[in-house]
Amino acid sequence: MGLKADNWIRKMALERKMIEPFCEANIGKGVVSYGLSSYGYDIRVGREFKIFTNVNSTVVDPKNFVEENVVDFEGDVCIVPANSFALARTIEYFKMPDDVLAICLGKSTYARCGIIVNVTPFEPGFEGHITIEISNTTPLPAKIYANEGIAQVLFLQGDEKCDTTYKDKKGKYQAQTGITLPRILK
């Protein structure tokens, strides 16, 4: 399994629409950087957020998630409360090849501020916007800047194609748009 370089990422984005919209340059002046890098792609966070709240005294249950756990926010800067959590989505829409797995890591700019970004792997055959999990581990409110970088995606190409892709198994988050809350198939 090999880590893919910028020339491969560029080719897949331009010829196969693996990443849309695609930014060929790495933009970093005055913003949290985003775009193509040597061995990855820095994704941007959109303007929509779901911020966790305790206003309704609910319990977070991944098997029975209720909308009252979050409040919707849209804007250029999202303030994540101290020791709190938010969901967001990428600006970019991904179409993963059947022999490629992507792993996403938070950007050091945010990590050095106590903001941890988690994204589960993009499985072969997955298509959709990426839901981003953002944890503010500090005792202070923290800013997240929309339309700027939030994490880096690394692309790993398998030595052979898998038997069953995410699309083949009709994954529950396939073709998601916007921020997708937890789902349990019944």
UniProtKB/Swiss-Prot annotation:
Reaction(s) catalysed by this chain's protein: dCTP + H2O + H(+) = dUTP + NH4(+)
EC category name: hydrolase
UniProt xrefs under SUPFAM superfamilies: dUTPase-like
Record pathway: Pyrimidine metabolism; dUMP biosynthesis; dUMP from dCTP (dUTP route): step 1/2
Gene Ontology MF term list: dCTP deaminase activity; nucleotide binding
Catalytic residues (UniProt): 133
Residues holding dCTP: 107-112, 152, 166, 176
Pfam families in the record: DCD
EC number: 3.5.4.13
Superkingdom per UniProt: Bacteria
Keywords in alphabetical order: Hydrolase, Nucleotide metabolism, Nucleotide-binding
Record has Transferase as a keyword: no
GO biological process: one example: dUTP biosynthetic process
Keyword presence, Nucleotide-binding: yes
Subunit structure comment from the entry: Homotrimer.
NCBIfam families tied to this protein: dCTP_deam
Family under the similarity heading: Belongs to the dCTP deaminase family.
PANTHER family: DCTP DEAMINASE
Known function: Catalyzes the deamination of dCTP to dUTP.
The protein, known as: dCTP deaminase
